[in-house]
């Protein structure tokens, strides 16, 4: 514990990815992807849908559709279905609530930096009892103006509360680490 405390003393703020880091959202994401691909007539037998956990939706759908209109249609179908059903099929990982409480009590600025749109992730964090621990909930935009993890991280870092602060990014995917490095 002391070693961890010494490491954390180098930071003022911590950015967290959400899916796969704080919340196990895989069941809802996978069910929603299955529904969208079925609706759009895409055969996904043999496709490991877990690989789509994390990357932006348009990037994932771009692997199956070349027409931008179809990518947008798939993205819209996904968001509509996920908001109604998939977003409720998630659970906070064990220990996350206590960790956030401890970090908040220690005075860290806590933020999210997720590829999920802010409009989508905020109600999920509220439903799971986590929103209260975050000073800023940062996510992708609904349009393509802030779609990549790098763009999301830059957006979060541009917030006034983080100016001049030493910030640590915590995530579970390569996209999280690339977004922090860029």
Q: What are these language model-derived features?
A:
Residues 39-43, 68-70, 106, 129-133, ...:
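Short helix-capping segments at alpha-helix termini
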Residues 118-168, 174-182:
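Substrate-recognition "cap/lid" segment bordering the active-site pocket of phosphatases
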